[in-house]
Amino acid sequence: MEEDLIQPQPDSETLTSPTSEVGAVELVEHEDDERVEQDPGYVTPPKDGKESVPVSPLTEADYLGGEDDVLLKHVLRQSTIVQEAFKDYSGFPLTVEELSRTYEANLFSPRVPPKKQANGTCEPNPRLNFYPVFAVPEALATYHIFFKNQRIPLSCRANRTQGDRILHLKAGAHIPEIVSLEEVPKIFEGLGKDEKRAANALQKSETENQNVLVELDGDNARLAVLKRTIEVSHFAYPALNLPPKVMRSVMDHLLIKRVEPLDSDQPEQNSEDGQPVVSDDDLARWLDSHDPTTLQERRKMMMAVILVTVELECLQRFFANPQTLRKIEESLHYAFRHGYVRQACKISNVELSNLVSYMGILHENRLGQNVLHCTLQGEARRDYVRDCIYLFLILTWQTAMGVWQQCLEERNLRELEKLLVRNRRELWTAFSERTAACQLADLIFPERLMQTLQNGLPDFVSQSILQNFRSFILERSGILPAMSCALPSDFVPLCYRECPPPLWSHCYLLRLANYLAHHSDLMENSSGEGLLECHCRCNLCTPHRSLVCNTELLSETQVIGTFEIQGPERQEGASNLKLTPALWTSAYLRKFIPEDYHAHQIKFYEDQSRPPKAPLTACVITQSQILAQLQAIQQARQEFLLKKGHGVYLDPQTGEELNTPSPSAAASCRPQKHAAQREQASHCGSAVPKATETARAVGRGGGILGRQPGRGSFRRGGNGELGKSRRGAGGQTPQGRGGRNHRQRRGTVFQRTRSEPASDGESRTVPAAARLVESQP
């Protein structure tokens, strides 16, 4: 292609900058076609000796250009993108549908994956600037566009005034389980005897009363407004079925043969269409019974296994895995900017909640919202959080099913059909419905496939993504989101006994979402002031990532950026350690103790009487002795600056004055020797070999957030030992203000004001604890 697209970096980091989004695409033309502007102060003389005709400058009326209209660049860029989309297309599409499909495939499903930036995210794609804003691309909605349109049960969540109380989970609650039709043979879809219609309910005639939502006494404010706003009888439930290719093979080789279109040329091939795969004679021989009732019950059981139970079994195997539950809760902490993710954002000063991903590709989207739940309280907050997690589970499962569907080829389906035929008798003669479902799940959803999908899922999402998904579902159901306050989870029953079997998968995901909301401590706000600002009671945060419970971690955060441990200068392989916010945050995000994570039970640390199974340690400096020595050095330095120092000292972080001496105190200052500080400095100097050895063991470690300079370091004295004067071993003759010592001291973090002189005695008796932090020249 003759022309390429580039995207220059915006001049400003703010989203309101005009160069950040619009107009960021520039077209690189050939050098022959480029117009080079000359300096108006000097004109190059023509080579042929003839004077060139001067070009009239652009006036105010035609500042957009004459022959080379700048507005044509927009059309040129768009035509370049369209030309690239049809570069490998045989022939030109004749319909709008073919044009849209090819254009979207080039934008969202390119042959070459997007390049990664240094921070791990994908680089911005300028080709997307011409795609309709806020439109859902059909190329991306491979599995998310399928729905199960079904009548809303009268026993749905919206018609249960005590739904919030029923869904409340206490400490010790376990993860929800699945059921089978043998365990729940009868279904109740009524309103219930405990529910009473509201006295002020709108009266409607029987012909007009097609609304499933009933106004009840005890409805919360949101549901009361919802029931007076809309009238619905059916809802588009997102599809949770197994891939169609798999289900077609299972139906054709286990239950009933699919009916194909009639072929008049070969009528013998159409004779078995629509017939059961297993005849009555074969089934009677396998079961050793000719009772018609027994045979009919067995056929009902196999139909329930294929249509309902095996789907529930695959859902439970995928989501109930401890590693998957941990990753789901981590994604929820990012989506709600909660717990340890909020703590990491605060210390690193990087908004980690801007990271989103899809199918393993990481993106940075600063337009997403992650604090919308903070505007709600009480039952409204719990309903919103529960619905967000419910949609997140649906989105994760649909993504997995889409990947599974796209990977299957004819060769794989033929092998699957062989397995089904080989195990047909074993499946039909299984002990129970749950046993048959487990055996069938082992065939169609093997362990290798499940682990592969679990390794790539779930994705990082934001609340804005879930809100768009919510609006997409409601619009497909004929509900206008702007005029109602409906949630998709309002139309799902709360228990299997009140839910029709085709919706059992949605009932399981709603119950699982409620469990995850309680297990992640998202239902209530447990944070407070001070150290409790980012507190979360879940097993991912407390006690190992909590600054309240882990004192070693708190001590480590207090020495971030205050020191640098240097190894021997001439020794090969010597490593230094500087605890920067980026290094600490990377280690903090990776810190996970599986022994104290209870995936299948709500078991908060504050509700336990026993100590944690693993010791509470810091992230980078895991030895408490080294951490205590660093904290003692920092404390000694601060005490010296506040009590014995002269002049005005500034805080390295806030710039505030740490001590402001009065005129009388400044006049009475005399050179004094501080034996206590010397003792402290010599004691700290003996700990350096041990600290240097620890620095090599810990290593510097790579950080995903980039490196940031520290604010202090350990440096050697004149003879290579800490605690000694930099002017030599004895520190005899002090130098004046113009000497080398003053030039080194002038660049420290705690600077002396020029208006206050320093005496020679003071320069001689500065303790080592204060000189160890002079890392910035």
UniProtKB/Swiss-Prot annotation:
Record note on modification: Might be cleaved by the viral protease.
Residue ranges crossing the lipid bilayer per the database entry: none
Subcellular location: Host cytoplasm
Keyword field: Chaperone, Eukaryotic host gene expression shutoff by virus, Eukaryotic host translation shutoff by virus, Host cytoplasm, Host gene expression shutoff by virus, Host-virus interaction, Inhibition of eukaryotic host translation factors by virus, Late protein, Methylation, Phosphoprotein, RNA-binding, Translational shunt, Transport
Main location: host cell
GO biological process: intracellular transport of viral protein in host cell; symbiont-mediated suppression of host gene expression; symbiont-mediated suppression of host translation initiation; viral translational shunt
Quaternary structure note: Monomer. Interacts with hexon protein; this interaction allows chaperoning and trimerization of hexon proteins. Interacts (via N-terminus) with host initiation factor EIF4G (via C-terminus). Interacts (via RRM domain) with viral mRNAs that contain the tripartite leader; this interaction allows ribosome shunting and expression of viral late mRNAs.
Role this protein plays: Protein that inhibits host translation while promoting late viral translation by ribosome shunting. Blocks host cap-dependent translation by binding to eIF4G, displacing MKNK1 from cap initiation complexes and preventing EIF4E phosphorylation. Binds to the tripartite leader sequence of viral late mRNAs and recruits host eIF4G, PABPC1/poly-A binding protein and 40S ribosomes subunits on viral mRNAs, allowing ribosome shunting and efficient translation of late viral mRNAs even though conventional translation via ribosome scanning from the cap has been shut off in the host cell.
Further information: All late proteins expressed from the major late promoter are produced by alternative splicing and alternative polyadenylation of the same gene giving rise to non-overlapping ORFs. A leader sequence is present in the N-terminus of all these mRNAs and is recognized by the viral shutoff protein to provide expression although conventional translation via ribosome scanning from the cap has been shut off in the host cell.
Name this protein carries in UniProt: Shutoff protein
Species this protein is from: Human adenovirus F serotype 41 (HAdV-41)
